[in-house]
Amino acid sequence: MWLAKIAGFVTSESTPGDGVHVGLPPHWRSVAWACGTWLAGRSVLLGSSTHIHAAGLLPELSVAFAPESLVEEAEAQALVPPASLALRWPGELPALVLDGAADLMHYPDRFTPVSTAADSVCLRDLAAEGAAPAAPGTTAATVPSGARPTTLTRAQLVARVETAGASTGAGNRSASRAVLVRSPDTAQMLQEVLVAWRAGRTAVVLTPEADDDVAAAAIRQEGITA
């Protein structure tokens, strides 16, 4: 439902530009906005507004948890409430800024995916620090700076997800139905979620501020074993 509504929002509120700026930390809303953007046939831009400016990019839409994290030059801007269950922005919105939760409710729960070429760019990680993809719930391996590509086409992202799943046994039938995804990096988190989904498993995403007690509770409640 959320992905369809976001895809409708993206399509209605913006025209294709350099991408949709998802200026959000690891969070279920980050997953929803990235996947909704892909459903709409658009590219996702990760990183801060500073990263966007430094790269000389002009996103068609900028989404963030705080006003100062938005890209002011974007065609449209939306603030998303950080509270997981919130259905609207908690306060007064800045002028011309949309509510990235309440304003989604106007859009249908169904959206026909936009056909997009496999070689089209789907993800630009402007804040990449050279962390290699890791299996769901594990720590990313350290690789030389710059070894992780900052730009991925749809075909490349699919290949990376398939490779990660095959190398880590993500589809192991004896594993629990849920996977704990705990990464401080949004791009890494997205890939771990996609690996879990491809294996038919549920991804339990922890936000960066979640401590070990929260992680232990999630593992216990979801019955996560591997």
Task: List the predicted regions and their residue ranges.
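Hydrophobic, Leu/Ile/Phe/Ala-enriched alpha-helical segments that form helix-helix packing faces
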Residues: I6-S14, W33-T37, G56, A66, ...
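Conserved coil-to-alpha-helix start sites within the AMP-binding
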Residues: L24-A34, R182-L194, D213
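Conserved pre-ATP/AMP-binding loop-to-beta segment of ANL
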Residues: S84-L180, P184-T186
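Conserved short alpha-helical elements in the N-terminal third of ANL/AMP-binding
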Residues: G36-A40, M189-T202
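A broadly used, surface-exposed interaction patch
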Residues: P16, S30-W33, A40-L46
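ANL superfamily AMP-binding
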Residues: W2-V22, H51-A54, R154-L180, T225
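Glycine- and other small-residue-rich loops at beta-strand/loop junctions that grip anionic moieties
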Residues: V22-G23, V181-R182, V204-P208
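Structural core segment of the AMP-binding/adenylate-forming
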Residues: R42-D119, G200-A226
